C-alpha cells in the first residue's frame, strides 16, 4: 500500500519511465549496477524496478535516520569495504536468488561523469557469477537532491528515465594474486559502465544538442568567448545562430555543401549551427592548404559558395585565395547585415520563443559536416561526418573525462582541424564549459597569457605547439590547468619533461584521426600510462591486421558510432565512398575503418603507436619505422625539427633521407644515440639534408608530400 502510494507520487512528480528488457531481472543470480547521481536513486529503483532487490549501503550511511525511515520500502544490508565478510554476505544473497543493487561508484557523482569504480562490486559479480544488469539513471542529477549545484540548471521535478541495459557477465579474471584479480575485475566493470552510458546517449542532431545544452545549463550561462572579450551566453549564441540560419537561406539550397573559411571566433560557431539547422552541410575549408589544396577540396565536395570574412582575409593576408579560386562564389559575413528585413527579424524573434521549429527535418544519421584530411600523403579528402558520429565522439570524451560547467577551454587549434572542432568547440559547448576561441595556435607568447588571464582549465594542442607555449610562458601562467592534452602528432619526451619541470603538469597524450571525429584513444587522470596514447574509447571495436615484416602489433582497424559516413575524393567528385576495410582473409567489411597506423596493445588495453603503415621503409629485408628514425634524430638534436622520407636504393631496395633544420647534425651523432638506445644501425640515415625551415601543414605536422617531391626531384636531377 505504502509502496504503491510513493510509486504514484513519484510517477506524477517526475514522470518516471523505465525502459529496457526487464526479463533479465528475473534470472537466478542478478547484480544490478546503476550509476549514482542523486540521493533519490535508491528510492527510484525500489519503487520502479519490477523486483524487490537488496541494496548494498555503506555502514556510515545505513545508520542514519533517513535509512531507518525507508525500511518499509527498501531492503538493504550494511556494507563495510574494510571487512571481507560484507562482500561474502552479498555473494551469499545473490546465490540465494535475491537481486542485489550495488552502486559501483560508491558515492554520488560531483561531476556528472562516472566517478571512480570500486573493485568490490566487480569482485562480487565475478565471485558469484551473477548476471550483471547495468542501469542508467538520467534526469535525477537535475534535482536539488544531486551534488551538481552550480554545474547544471536545477529544477524541482525534471523528467527521470531508468534505462535497463542488456545483461552481461563478468568472469573471474586470471591472476596469481587476489588483489590483482579484484583490480582487473574493477576495470572490466568500469568498461561495462562506460558502455552503458554510450548505449543510452540521446538521438539528436547537432542543433538539437545545442538547444539541450541551453536547457541543461541555462540560457544565461556564458559559453563562447573570443578576442573581442565579450562572452556569448547560450541565449546570445542561439540568437546569432538564428540570424545566420535565416540569411544563409538566401545564398544556398537545402542539402547544399557550403564552404566555411572562418577564424576561431564566436560568429564561426553561430555560422556552423545556423547552417546545420537549415539543412546545409558546412565544409570547413583549410585556408593553410594553399590554392592547390583548396581547389581539390572544392572539387571533391562540389562546393559552389564559400562564406568568409573580409576582416579575416585582411588579417590573415589571404586575399589571394578569392582572387585565384574563382570557380566558387565568395560571400562575406560583413555584407549580410544589410540583407536583414523586418520579416527576417520577426522570424528570428518567433524562433527564439520556439527554437526547435527553426530546424528543418533531419535525422542523426544525416550528413552534418565535412572536414578535410591534411593532405600529408596526397590530395586532401573530404571526410563526411553525420550528427551521430560527431556527437558520439563528444559523448565518448564526456564518458571518460570529468569536464564540467566550471571548466574553461582554451581553443587555439583551427576549427577546420577535427581536433579543434570536436574537442575545441563541440565538447565544451555540450558539457556546459566555457570556451575561449583564439585565431592562431602559433602565437606562442599570447596563448599562455590568455590561459592565465581567462583562468582556463583545459588546454590542448600538438606537441610542437605545447613545447613552444612552455618555452614562452611564465611558470605561473598555467596555475589553473587541470587537463593538458596532446594530439595530432607524437608527444616528444622533451616537451613532456619541460611541462613537468616548469609547471608541475602532466601532459595527457591521445590519438585520433579525422575519420573518427577524431578522438580514438586518450589518457585521462583515471586511466593513464606513460608511453601510450591511452585506451580505445568506449563504444568502439578495434582489431589488428597482421602486416608482413612487422613482428609486433598490426594495422589498426576501427568500428564504432564515431566513424565517418565516408570520403569525398577529387577523383570522383560528390560521390560518397562509405568506409570499408579488408579483414585478415582479404574480404572487404563495411563499417570498418583502416587507420593505416601500426599499433600494439598491452595486457591492460593501452595503445602504443609504432608508426604509419605507409611510413615504413624496407631496407635490406627489414621493416624500419620512419617515426623511429625521427625519434633518433630528435634525441640527438632535441631543439630542432626533423622529418624522414624514402628514396630507392639499388643495393638495399630503399634508403632513408633525413631532412633537418640542424646544420651541424652528423651521422656519427645519430649512430651514437642509436647505440645508446638499442636502435638498429639500419635506422640511421646516411643521407642527411639540411633545410632552413621544414615545410609544414596547418596542423604543425611536416608536409611529407612536399619532402617526397624534393627527394624525387633530386634523384631525377642526379640521373
UniProtKB/Swiss-Prot annotation:
AMP-binding: region residues: 233-646
E.C. number: 2.3.1.40, 6.2.1.20
Record's keyword annotation contains Lyase: no
Catalytic activity: a 2-acyl-sn-glycero-3-phosphoethanolamine + a fatty acyl-[ACP] = a 1,2-diacyl-sn-glycero-3-phosphoethanolamine + holo-[ACP]; a long-chain fatty acid + holo-[ACP] + ATP = a long-chain fatty acyl-[ACP] + AMP + diphosphate
UniProt keyword annotations, A-Z: Acyltransferase, ATP-binding, Cell inner membrane, Cell membrane, Ligase, Membrane, Multifunctional enzyme, Nucleotide-binding, Transferase, Transmembrane, Transmembrane helix
Transmembrane domains' residue ranges: 258-277, 409-433
CDD domains associated with the record: LPLAT_AGPAT-like (cd07989)
Record-annotated active site: 36
Subcellular location: Cell inner membrane
Molecular function via GO: acyl-[acyl-carrier-protein]-phospholipid O-acyltransferase activity; ATP binding; long-chain fatty acid [acyl-carrier-protein] ligase activity; medium-chain fatty acid-CoA ligase activity
Protein's membrane topology: Multi-pass membrane protein
GO BP terms: fatty acid metabolic process; phospholipid biosynthetic process
Primary localization class, coarse: membrane
UniProt GO cellular component terms: plasma membrane
PROSITE patterns, A to Z: AMP_BINDING
Any Pfam family hit: Acyltransferase
Region (Acyltransferase): 15-138
Function description: Plays a role in lysophospholipid acylation. Transfers fatty acids to the 1-position via an enzyme-bound acyl-ACP intermediate in the presence of ATP and magnesium. Its physiological function is to regenerate phosphatidylethanolamine from 2-acyl-glycero-3-phosphoethanolamine (2-acyl-GPE) formed by transacylation reactions or degradation by phospholipase A1.
Family the entry assigns: In the N-terminal section; belongs to the 2-acyl-GPE acetyltransferase family.
NCBIfam families per the UniProt record, alphabetical: PRK08043.1 (NF005959)
Protein name stated in the entry: Bifunctional protein Aas
Amino acid at each position: 500500500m505504502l509502496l504503491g502510494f510513493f510509486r504514484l507520487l513519484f510517477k506524477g512528480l517526475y514522470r518516471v519511465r523505465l525502459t529496457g528488457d526487464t526479463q533479465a531481472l528475473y534470472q537466478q543470480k542478478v547484480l544490478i549496477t546503476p550509476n549514482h547521481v542523486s540521493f533519490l536513486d535508491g528510492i527510484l529503483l525500489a519503487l520502479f524496478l519490477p523486483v524487490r532487490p537488496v541494496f548494498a549501503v555503506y555502514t556510515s550511511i545505513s545508520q542514519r535516520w533517513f535509512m531507518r525511515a525507508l525500511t518499509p520500502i527498501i531492503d538493504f544490508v550494511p556494507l563495510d569495504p574494510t571487512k571481507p565478510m560484507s562482500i561474502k554476505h552479498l555473494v551469499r544473497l545473490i546465490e540465494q536468488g535475491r537481486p542485489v543493487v550495488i552502486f559501483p561508484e560508491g558515492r554520488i557523482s560531483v561531476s556528472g561523469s562516472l566517478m571512480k569504480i570500486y573493485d568490490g562490486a566487480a569482485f562480487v559479480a565475478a565471485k558469484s557469477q551473477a548476471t550483471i544488469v547495468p542501469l542508467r539513471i538520467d534526469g535525477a542529477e537535475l534535482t536539488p537532491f544531486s551534488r551538481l549545484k552550480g554545474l547544471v540548471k536545477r529544477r524541482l521535478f525534471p523528467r527521470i528515465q531508468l534505462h535497463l541495459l542488456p545483461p552481461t557477465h563478468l568472469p573471474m579474471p586470471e591472476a596469481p594474486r587476489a588483489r590483482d584479480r579484484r583490480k582487473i575485475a574493477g576495470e572490466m566493470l568500469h568498461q561495462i559502465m562506460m558502455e552503458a552510458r554510450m548505449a543510452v546517449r540521446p538521438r539528436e542532431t547537432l542543433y538539437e544538442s545545442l538547444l539541450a545544452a541551453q536547457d541543461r545549463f541555462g540560457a544565461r550561462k556564458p559559453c563562447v568567448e573570443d578576442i573581442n572579450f565579450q562572452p556569448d551566453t547560450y541565449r546570445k549564441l542561439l540568437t546569432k545562430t538564428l540570424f545566420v540560419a535565416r540569411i544563409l537561406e538566401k545564398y544556398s539550397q537545402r542539402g547544399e555543401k557550403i564552404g566555411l573559411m572562418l577564424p576561431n571566433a564566436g560568429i564561426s560557431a553561430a555560422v556552423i549551427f545556423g547552417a546545420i539547422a537549415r539543412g546545409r552541410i558546412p565544409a570547413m575549408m583549410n585556408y593553410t592548404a594553399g590554392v592547390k589544396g583548396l581547389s581539390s577540396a572544392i572539387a571533391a565536395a562540389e562546393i559552389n559558395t564559400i562564406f568568409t570574412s573580409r576582416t579575416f582575409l585582411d588579417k590573415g593576408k589571404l586575399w589571394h585565395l578569392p582572387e585565384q579560386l574563382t570557380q566558387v562564389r565568395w560571400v562575406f559575413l560583413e555584407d549580410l547585415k544589410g540583407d536583414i528585413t523586418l520579416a527576417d527579424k520577426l522570424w528570428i524573434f518567433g524562433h527564439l520563443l520556439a527554437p526547435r521549429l527553426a530546424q528543418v527535418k533531419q535525422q542523426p544519421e544525416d550528413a552534418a559536416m565535412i572536414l578535410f584530411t591534411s593532405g600529408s600523403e596526397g590530395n586532401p579528402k573530404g571526410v563526411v561526418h553525420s550528427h551521430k558520429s560527431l556527437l558520439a565522439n563528444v559523448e565518448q570524451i564526456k564518458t571518460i573525462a570529468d569536464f564540467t560547467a566550471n571548466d574553461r577551454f582554451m581553443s587555439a587549434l583551427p576549427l577546420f582541424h577535427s581536433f579543434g572542432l570536436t574537442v575545441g568547440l563541440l565538447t565544451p559547448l555540450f558539457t556546459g564549459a566555457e570556451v575561449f576561441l583564439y585565431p592562431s595556435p602559433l602565437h606562442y607568447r599570447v596563448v599562455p597569457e590568455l590561459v592565465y588571464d581567462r583562468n582556463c582549465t583545459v588546454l590542448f594542442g600538438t606537441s610542437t605547439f605545447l613545447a613552444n607555449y612552455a618555452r614562452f610562458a611564465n611558470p605561473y601562467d598555467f596555475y589553473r590547468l587541470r587537463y593538458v592534452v596532446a594530439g595530432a602528432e607524437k608527444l616528444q619526451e622533451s616537451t613532456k619533461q619541460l611541462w613537468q619541470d616548469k609547471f608541475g603538469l602532466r601532459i595527457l597524450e591521445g590519438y585520433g584521426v579525422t575519420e573518427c571525429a577524431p578522438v580514438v584513444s586518450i589518457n585521462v587522470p583515471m586511466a593513464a600510462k606513460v608511453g601510450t596514447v591511452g585506451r580505445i574509447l568506449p563504444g568502439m571495436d578495434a582489431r589488428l591486421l597482421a602486416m608482413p615484416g612487422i613482428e609486433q602489433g598490426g594495422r589498426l582497424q576501427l568500428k564504432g558510432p564515431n566513424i565517418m559516413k565516408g570520403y569525398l575524393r577529387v577523383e570522383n567528385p560528390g560521390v560518397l565512398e562509405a568506409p570499408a576495410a579488408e579483414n585478415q582473409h582479404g574480404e572487404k567489411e563495411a563499417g570498418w575503418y583502416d587507420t593505416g597506423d601500426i599499433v600494439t596493445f598491452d595486457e591492460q588495453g593501452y595503445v602504443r603507436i609504432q608508426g604509419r603503415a605507409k611510413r615504413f621503409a624496407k631496407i635490406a629485408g627489414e621493416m624500419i619505422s620512419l617515426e623511429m628514425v625521427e625519434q633518433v634524430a630528435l634525441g640527438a638534436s632535441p631543439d630542432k625539427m626533423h622529418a624522414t622520407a624514402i628514396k630507392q636504393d639499388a643495393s638495399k631496395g630503399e634508403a632513408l633521407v633525413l631532412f633537418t633544420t640542424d646544420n651541424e647534425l652528423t651521422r656519427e651523432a645519430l649512430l651514437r644515440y642509436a647505440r645508446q638506445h638499442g636502435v638498429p644501425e639500419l635506422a640511421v640515415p646516411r643521407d642527411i639534408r639540411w633545410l632552413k625551415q621544414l615545410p609544414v601543414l596547418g596542423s604543425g605536422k611536416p608536409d611529407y608530400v612536399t619532402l617526397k617531391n624534393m627527394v624525387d626531384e633530386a634523384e631525377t636531377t642526379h640521373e
